[in-house]
Amino acid sequence: MKQIRNFSIIAHIDHGKSTLSDRLIQVCGGLTDREMDAQVLDSMDLERERGITIKAQSVTLDYKAKDGLVYQLNFIDTPGHVDFSYEVSRSLAACEGALLVVDAGQGVEAQTLANCYTALDMNLDVVPILNKIDLPQADPERVAAEIEDIVGIDAIDAVRCSAKTGVGVDEVLEVIVAKIPPPEGDPNAPLQALIIDSWFDNYLGVVSLVRIKHGSLKKGDKFKVMSTGQNHTADRVGIFTPKQTDKTELKTGEVGFVIAGLKEIHGAPVGDTLTLAKNGAEKPLPGFKKVKPQVYAGVFPISTDEYENFRDALNKLSLNDASLFFEPESSSALGFGFRIGYLGLLHMEIVQERLEREYNLELITTAPTVVYEVVMTSGETIYVDNPSDLPAINNIEEMREPIVEANILVPKEYLGNVITLCIEKRGTQVNMVYHGNQVAVTYHLPMAEVVMDFFDRLKSTSRGYASLEYNFIRFDPADMVRLDILINGDRVDALAMVIHRSNIRHRGLALVDKMKELIPRQMFDIAIQAAVGSQIIARSTVKALRKDVTAKCYGGDVSRKKKLLNKQKEGKKRMKQVGNVEVPQEAFLAVLKLNE
């Protein structure tokens, strides 16, 4: 057990952690050169395409250190993006240490900082590593000072390496062995194993990645899942070298997989504890905090007969993604679908792309909304995540919107733009600290403004240099109203949105104009209105297509033309009473894109 090291890598997007992990695998001979592939651990197509890590993965490597001993390194890959912080906290819970990888050219970023604090809170040993020293703009001295200044850990003797060229990778391995403590645990105590991650394999059923804290798990053991109390038999246990490799037993301190032929997707929830069915442990391990979705959106299949497939796809995906929440929803405009809760906008995009790709679904998503706290005149408090569930204005005593604390790290020269953006988004400044060339600003911002397009705007005003990390702090009273879109007097539920009263005029006009371009002309006039309660704040009309009825009159009397025009008018009026308007899918998507 003294020769085991469990660690993960904390790094910002693009600071090179997936490349570094490739090098570690190569040096330790986990894969032959032929099987080596760039970013081995990012196995999803989507991960490779966007160059980000979404799912936590694990690898067990054998490393012969300079002291002649062979160490077993269990490396758990973590995502770097703020939306996946939950995946990160899970990965860290299984480790004793973490490598903080920082790009020697760019320096520390907000999300790295957030994940690093998570690691320090969990009492992990954090070892700084400066990567990309082969780049011409690398400045390891400055970055080392920045790490000490901003993060507050010793970085003078940080290992300098370049994962791309392979310089310094051996030193990284030596540092892992020297600086990260071996796991603690009692091999003779009853089994306690933490489920770090689980996913569904079409052939094997549920595969769970576990970290054995105490005791050991052998192939063929009967074990019990502590939260559900169900017993299963371990058909296969083993490790990833990144390939699945079977073993007869997982010992204390090791990280590996367990397959028990579970077909029930929720049979092994992430963060749960496994113990043996006979003489098991008394109490479960402390898991992770359950995350609450922050952003909700309605998602509907484009053709209604896809609904069943959509439901199965969501069930399979939610096994893989413990933070996904969904419930059925129906809309008069879009039919049946689901209301899905996400951790943030990137998470939302990724989930939608995965559904479309991995399950061949065609989906349409309504505008994302956050959860509002509504105090009714009757005195009860309700939580609303769907604008069309909002009670009537006269029943609402007060609406409270979620406020987040956003920590932004930005180079000095872009500070002005960032502050302007935060003020426009109704933010209040809480703190500002200068660290060398970087400024750390803290703002309290309404979450609704952050989920819409804050991140993109932040990146564009700062030329991509600013980085953002945010978390929910409280609900604050705010003057929020529901903006409805009426088409020929009928409310379209899928287009409703909750916005601040100061924005309604501007937003209403923009929406109505956009809808006017997108709704195809019919045989009768279509009135598009934006309303708050019963008050109409903007309107435009899609003009009717009409035949030139007077074309056949040659010269002739004006009363003859009048008669024909009036007859046409009557007809159009009748059509308007019975006709209904199809709102095309583009119109819904346009509402999402309104802010751009």
Swiss-Prot record:
Presence of keyword S-adenosyl-L-methionine: no
BP-aspect Gene Ontology terms: positive regulation of translation
PROSITE patterns: G_TR_1, G_TR_2
Known catalytic reactions: GTP + H2O = GDP + phosphate + H(+)
SUPFAM superfamilies: EF-G C-terminal domain-like (SSF54980), P-loop containing nucleoside triphosphate hydrolases (SSF52540), Translation proteins (SSF50447)
Record's keyword terms, sorted: Cell inner membrane, Cell membrane, GTP-binding, Hydrolase, Membrane, Nucleotide-binding, Protein biosynthesis
Domain tr-type G: 2-184
Group of enzyme by EC: hydrolase
GO cellular component: a single term: plasma membrane
Membrane topology: Peripheral membrane protein
Positions that bind GTP: D14, H15, G16, K17, S18, T19, N131, K132, I133, D134
Assigned EC number: 3.6.5.n1
Subcellular location: Cell inner membrane
Entry's Gene Ontology molecular function annotations: GTP binding; GTPase activity; guanosine tetraphosphate binding; ribosome binding; translation elongation factor activity
Protein role: Required for accurate and efficient protein synthesis under certain stress conditions. May act as a fidelity factor of the translation reaction, by catalyzing a one-codon backward translocation of tRNAs on improperly translocated ribosomes. Back-translocation proceeds from a post-translocation (POST) complex to a pre-translocation (PRE) complex, thus giving elongation factor G a second chance to translocate the tRNAs correctly. Binds to ribosomes in a GTP-dependent manner.
Family: Belongs to the TRAFAC class translation factor GTPase superfamily. Classic translation factor GTPase family. LepA subfamily.
UniProt cross-references to HAMAP family, sorted A to Z: LepA
PANTHER family xref list: TRANSLATION FACTOR GUF1 HOMOLOG, CHLOROPLASTIC (PTHR43512:SF4), TRANSLATION FACTOR GUF1-RELATED (PTHR43512)
Protein name in the entry: Elongation factor 4
Organism for this UniProt entry: Shewanella baltica (strain OS195)
Organismal lineage: Bacteria, Pseudomonadati, Pseudomonadota, Gammaproteobacteria, Alteromonadales
